[in-house]
Structure formats: structure tokens, C-alpha cells
Amino acid sequence: MISAAIVGGTGYTGIELIRLLSAHPKVSIDLLTSRSEAGTRADEIFPSLRGISDIVFSDLGDETLATLQQCDVVFFATPHGVAMKQAEALTQAGVKVIDLAADFRLQSLSEFEHWYQQMHTCPDLLKTAVYGLPEVNRAKIAEALVVGNPGCYPTTAILGLKPIIEAQNKQSKQLIESRIVIDAKSGVSGAGRQASLALNYAESTDNFKAYSVEGHRHLPEIEQGVAQLLDSQFKHRIRFLPHLVPMIRGMLSSIHMELTDAGALVDWQQVFEQSYASEQFIDVMPKGLYPDTRSVRASNRLRIAVHQDNERAELTVIVVQDNLVKGAAGQAVQNMNVMFGLDESLGLNFAPIVP
């Protein structure tokens, strides 16, 4: 059995990790930490875990840190800035690290410090950390000691653009114009479990709003992901605008592009179907069908629809996922499976919840 620890088990992604790993046939959760709930059983705080896990929360003290070094893998479901303080000692002990925060997502130290407004305490490890999007970096993840789990918005954006960028790489002519617009909507769980006036029921229900209009910290992550895929001379300008919608979990991103004359000759439906034919967690919808967020609820699946309008020279890609699963905890488990040479679907092969 793989000995796993979860640091920060009281947030929504932490709860999802407990749920997923408790059902994983090759994993044992041997340590669960929380500064605020140390000494309390997890199923006392979250009744949904009754009969699933009775593990007791530990404080993140010196004794716990020593125990972490005895595990095979440590998941950090913590605020930004926590994993970087522990990762070096853990990797030196041979422990694999999967960070669900942003400490190891951005390769650029200056970009991280600009967008997250804190100094990175482990810059050397940042250079070797792998961006944990299996559909893009599977081979590198398999060899990684540290994986930076992607943000929820970048997961939809990068996977929604990947077939287009790869098709562009094979062409001498530009297929889409330089400007890409990503219009994204997330359920309120994406903002976390902490108390917030903006997330109060009376504030967020029956309401729909844009936020971080002047610039969201997931933008450089999206730009980095596109740049890593792109090996042609064509560059793109990305406009990313997130919105908060009155639902608990779920995410929908609409990606809008303008086709060139050469791009209008491409059958983009076929391109997407061929690109993701072997990916078990990505479902390309048949032409004319479009996914909704409920169709992926509580699952690790991501559904994509493609609409090509040659008359208006427009290409629209619609992507949906559960922001807490494929957008967070499920993807972390998928990364763990890759890191340990397991089938990627292990512990994740379950149907979405409907209704």
C-alpha cells in the first residue's frame, strides 16, 4: 500500500482528497493534519466521512513533520506558501510531494512572487518541479518528486486549447488569429471554505458576477501552459475573465477564437476527437451536443464541445469539469497514480452524480 499524508484536511479540496483516497485500493491515509482541528476525528467534523474514515487530525508540529518523512507521498491541500517550506526536507527523505496550491505551478520565480505577493522559499526545487497536467506532462510526472497540481481554471483552458495548439504546430500557416478569449464560470466552492462576506448565502445566491477583471493569478499559469505547448512561430494574446455563479461546484469555460482562412479548412471536431481518443478522463462531445456542469459533478471527467462557424470565422470550445475533482483533488490523485506507475483511473473510475 502507498502510505499517504494529507496536510490541510479541512478545506474543500482536503475533504475531497479524503473521500477519494479512502476508496483507493492501493492507498492508506496514514496522516491527516489540521492546526485548528488537531485531536478531532475527521468524521466528527464531516459526517459525510462516517463509515469511510475515522482518522484523527494531527497538528503540524515537529513530531508530525518527522512522521511525514516516513510516508510515500504527501498531499498539500493548504494555502499558498505552505508546501514550499516543507517540500525540500520531504524530497530529501525520498517522499513524493503533490501541492494543490500554487507553490510549484509557475516556473518563473518573478511571476510567482508578483502574482502571489510572497517570496518563494524553495526556488531550487521550483526549477525541477513538474506541472501536474497528465494529459500534457505524463512522462515528466512519472519521474517527478514534486508536482504542482494545476489550478482549476487553467485545467479547462489548457486542455481546451491543447488540440488547437498542437494542430497549429504542424502547419506553416496560422490557423487561428492571435487573440484568445477565455470566459470562465465557477461555483462558489472554488473560492474555498473560509468565511467571506462575498460568499454568504444572501450575497452569492441569485447573483452572478465577474471578478479579478483587472487580472487573475491563473492567467500566467494559462499563458505558461500555452507557451509550453507551442513550438511554432505564432504567439497568442490571452484575455481571461472569471465569473462566480450561484452553484456549489462545477466550472464551465468558453474559449473563443477567430479562424484564419487556413483554419476554416480544418475539421476541428475531428482534430479534438483524435487528440483525446486515448484519454480516459476527457470526453469530446459529438458534434452539435454541448456539456453542462452537472454532467461531470463529483467525477474526474472533463467534457469538451467544439463549435466551428466558418461563415463568421469563429471557433468556440466549451469545457466543463468539477472544480473540486478534475480541477483539484481528483487530478492530484491522477497525478499520484502516474507517479507510482498505477493505472490512472485507479480510485477515480466512477460516474458523475445525477441529479
Swiss-Prot record:
First-listed, main subcellular location of the protein, grouped into a coarse class: cytoplasm
Reactions catalysed: N-acetyl-L-glutamate 5-semialdehyde + phosphate + NADP(+) = N-acetyl-L-glutamyl 5-phosphate + NADPH + H(+)
GO BP terms: L-arginine biosynthetic process
Enzyme class: oxidoreductase
Associated pathway: Amino-acid biosynthesis; L-arginine biosynthesis; N(2)-acetyl-L-ornithine from L-glutamate: step 3/4
HAMAP family: ArgC_type1 (MF_00150)
Sequence similarity: Belongs to the NAGSA dehydrogenase family. Type 1 subfamily.
Annotated protein name in UniProt: N-acetyl-gamma-glutamyl-phosphate reductase
